[in-house]
Regions:
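Boundary/activation segment at the start of structured domains
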Residues: 2-4, 11, 30, 35-124, ...
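Bacterial N-terminal signal peptides that target proteins for export
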Residues: 4-23
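Bacterial N-terminal signal peptides
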Residues: 20-32
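Structural recognition of the beta-strand scaffold that forms the well-ordered cores
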Residues: 59-62, 92-96, 127-131, 168-172, ...
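Solvent-exposed loop/turn segments at secondary-structure junctions
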Residues: 66-70, 98-102, 133-138, 147, ...
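Extracytoplasmic/secreted proteins, especially bacterial periplasmic and envelope-associated proteins
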Residues: 74-78, 82, 104, 108-115, ...
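A short, glycine/acidic-enriched catalytic loop
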Residues: 133-163
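Active-site-proximal C-terminal subdomain of hydrolase catalytic domains
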Residues: 174-262
Length: 269
C-alpha cells in the first residue's frame, strides 16, 4: 500500500498538519491488521495445550487366559510385541496360562490393572489391553491349571473403571467377544473384538501361533497400517476370506467407540 504526500506552501504548521494526516492514514490502514493480531490467541486450537503423541506413554497389558492350548500363549506374546513396536509400550506386561501354570487369572489381571495408574498419567496416557482365549455368550474362559472361571463383561468393566485411566484400547480375540462391547465401548474406550456377540471365531488350533483374527489383525494388518481402524478393516476382510474358504460361518469382527482415542494413535514407521 502506498500513501501519497502532497507538497504545499503551508510552512511549518502545514508540515505538522500534513504529518498528522499521514499518521491518521497509517493508523486507518493498519487497524484491521492490528485487530486481527489481537484476536489471534483466542483462535488457537484447544488441543495445543495437550501433550503431543510423542509425549504420551503407552502401556500394554496382554493376557492369554486359556491354558489348555499354546496358541493363546503365543498370541498374547506376539500381539503385545506388535502393538509395542507400532505404538510404543512402556511397560509391556504379558501373562499367560499353560497346562500347569496359573499366571493369567482373573485376580492377577485385576492386580495388574490396579498397578497400571502408578506407572502412567491416567489423564493423558494410553492403556492397551489385549485378551485372547475361548469365549462364550457369558464372557471369556479363564483356564489356569485345573481351575476354570469366566471373565464377564461386567467384571472386566469394573476393573477398567477402577484404574481411572481415561484413554483405553481393548482388543479381545475370542468367540462371542462382541458381548463385551455394550459394557466397555465409549468415546474414551476403543473396543475391537474377533467376533460379534452371536458367533464363534476360528483358528485356535493348539500348535498354531495365531488365531484367524490374531493373524489377520496383529500379525498382518497392524504391521502395515497407520491406524487401528485401518488395520481392523484389512483384518476383517482377511478373516472373512479365510472363513469362507474353509466353509465356516463368518465371525463378524467388531469395532466400537474410541472417538477420543483414535486421534491420539498413529503407528510408527
Amino acid at each position: 500500500m502506498q500513501i501519497a504526500v502532497l507538497r504545499t506552501g503551508l510552512g511549518v504548521r502545514g508540515n505538522a498538519l500534513r504529518a498528522g494526516a499521514v499518521l491518521i492514514a497509517l493508523l486507518a490502514a493498519f487497524a484491521p491488521m492490528l485487530a486481527s493480531a489481537q484476536v489471534a490467541p483466542a483462535q488457537l486450537d484447544p488441543a495445543q495445550g495437550a501433550p503431543s503423541q510423542a509425549l504420551r506413554k503407552v502401556t500394554v497389558v496382554s493376557f492369554g487366559l486359556f491354558g489348555g492350548q499354546d496358541v493363546f500363549r503365543s498370541e498374547a506374546t506376539g500381539a503385545a510385541a506388535v502393538v509395542a513396536s507400532r505404538f510404543g509400550g512402556d511397560p509391556v506386561v504379558v501373562r499367560f496360562n499353560t497346562r500347569k501354570s496359573r499366571d493369567a487369572t482373573i485376580d492377577s489381571l485385576a492386580a495388574t490393572l490396579d498397578a497400571v495408574p502408578k506407572r502412567m498419567d491416567p489423564g493423558t496416557d494410553i492403556l492397551f489391553l489385549i485378551l485372547t482365549s475361548h469365549g462364550s455368550p457369558e464372557g471369556l474362559a479363564v483356564t489356569a491349571g485345573r481351575r476354570s472361571a469366566t471373565l464377564t463383561p461386567a467384571r472386566l468393566a469394573g476393573m477398567l473403571d477402577r484404574t481411572g485411566v481415561r484413554h483405553k484400547v481393548v482388543i479381545i480375540s475370542a468367540c462371542y467377544s462382541g458381548v463385551f462391547i455394550p459394557r466397555l465401548a465409549s468415546a474414551d474406550t476403543l473396543v475391537i473384538t474377533a467376533a460379534d456377540r452371536n458367533h464363534s471365531s476360528f483358528g485356535c488350533e493348539d500348535k498354531a501361533k495365531w488365531t484367524y483374527f490374531g493373524d489377520a489383525f496383529f500379525n498382518s494388518a497392524l504391521r502395515q497400517s497407520e491406524t487401528l481402524r485401518e488395520a481392523f478393516s484389512i483384518a476383517r476382510s482377511l478373516v472373512l476370506t479365510w472363513e469362507l474358504r474353509n466353509g465356516f460361518e463368518p465371525s463378524h469382527p467388531q469395532i466400537a467407540g474410541g472417538e477420543n482415542v483414535e486421534p491420539l494413535l498413529v503407528a510408527r514407521h
